[in-house]
């Protein structure tokens, strides 16, 4: 029995004061005293130093270790939970963007282009044939999401339930959930497995046992825990019309597409199994279907070099044929068992130095337009598994610090989000204005509407509006139509039926953005209909604004 779970007092030396672990009366007493101290501080309007309270009371009651936030949260009376949870919330950045992200993994399977090219990408770890054989393609099995998936034996229902319960115990509001389906190319799996997987994700939220995806979506729409979106990782060659239509029926609203490089020779040399031209076609098809598009890019690939890397990112941000809505930057890692590892061993390939990599990404972040969101700046592969490559676990932080040295600033969506600003810098917006930015991307006219505090450069909410192009293949979007691809109000999560004047959700920003989008669609686009790609759990919200279910979208005819 471990010290923490042993109810008996334990002392290392004879005559020493006894030390108590978990499951002892002393531990329970300490947790109760901490909760009482928090309640009293709240009643008296005092600021709380939680660490000091825990340290003092744990020492006073001779505990072997301080109580964790989970222990304290479980002891808070229901009447005080709304006021005290923000003080105890572990990792507040998890829900700072207004939603609780639940990452799940599909079962391990071989890469779809293996049959065509005879091999996987040179840098790719993981998969059934790799040194990490129980992992999914491009993962090692030691990432936090991978380990949760392996513990659940890749069961989607259990993965969802376990992660939601974990977030609840950490003090997060989980009424608005966004799924990210990871683990290789999900759309290359058999359709019956995909249906089983999606059905179980929705059933894990609603508690209903469904017979098919349509039934699961119907019950998920009425669930107390709302599925506000699903993100699917895919490749350009598995992002064609049939794939897109299937993903729309699943309730998918965002795609993560592996691009890795904007150069055809690099795509060929790294054995990607698709062309850059295929990337551009998939981007246009996806946006014309209403999806938000997030690209994966890899600096430091073989045969690139610093200047070519920077030029590649300039091309990505400035060329209208690319211009994704979001970006994940994954610097190249050398991992045992990959083709790149063999090149590294022979000296044919060498990574940038750690300082050079920080310089490169700092320069890239300065190029990011204000309508693009940088979701990640490095893989969460544990450092002991990395033979060569990124040597820091806090790469984003180091890059932002280097930008200060350069006198530049990152103005991407995530850096400016009100929730992130509040968590990291304790800054709140003062004067909020509606700001509009128009640009051309992927054969269409894009309008990026946002509520911002321009002086402090803080973003409260955004809307992405697109005039559907003539090449749109979805029947719902064939007539003269515009589509809202994203509506998001940031800040920490507020419950579906709750109001909190100190938060930014449910304060009317979303309605105002939709009204402006309707005006632009009617008066400037000349559209007769406005469609929205709405997450399954958000359809009720749009019904209140006069929208009705229209195939896989919700839409409204503009008078």
From Swiss-Prot:
Pathway assignment: tRNA modification; 5-methoxycarbonylmethyl-2-thiouridine-tRNA biosynthesis
Cofactor remark from the record: Binds 1 [4Fe-4S] cluster. The cluster is coordinated with 3 cysteines and an exchangeable S-adenosyl-L-methionine.
Residues binding [4Fe-4S] cluster, per UniProt: 111, 121, 124
Biological process (GO), any one: regulation of transcription by RNA polymerase II
Family matches, as PANTHER family: ELONGATOR COMPLEX PROTEIN 3, HISTONE ACETYLTRANSFERASE-RELATED
Family: Belongs to the ELP3 family.
Protein name: Elongator complex protein 3
